[in-house]
Amino acid sequence: MKEGIHPTYRKVLFHDTSVNKYFLIGSTLQTDRTMKWEDGKEYPYMTLDISSESHPFYTGEQRVVSTEGRVANFNRRFGALKGKV
């Protein structure tokens, strides 16, 4: 591998702000902010809006979406006009 062209791989502290959970994960993400972790060391810090800790797919809190199609919706709205025009 060529020297100097690959990003630096290091531990980064991610914070899911929606559920206030922290994750220490290896990443190549570049950030200027740092934060002290439970082990007393300072790590690069990045906030997240959503992660596996808060996403409905992973938490099991999925909504059931109606599978009714666009044609059925059209027929429901305008089906009564079928023979009148």
Curated annotation (Swiss-Prot):
An example Gene Ontology CC term for this record: ribonucleoprotein complex
A GO molecular-function annotation: structural constituent of ribosome
NCBIfam families linked: L31, PRK01678.1
UniProt KW keywords: Ribonucleoprotein, Ribosomal protein
A Pfam short name: Ribosomal_L31
Taxonomic path: Bacteria, Pseudomonadati, Pseudomonadota, Gammaproteobacteria, Vibrionales
Protein name: Large ribosomal subunit protein bL31B
Family of this protein: Belongs to the bacterial ribosomal protein bL31 family. Type B subfamily.
Biological process terms in GO annotation: translation
Gene: rpmE2
Domain of life: Bacteria
Subunit (UniProt): Part of the 50S ribosomal subunit.
Naturally occurring in which organism (per UniProt): Aliivibrio salmonicida (strain LFI1238) (Vibrio salmonicida (strain LFI1238))
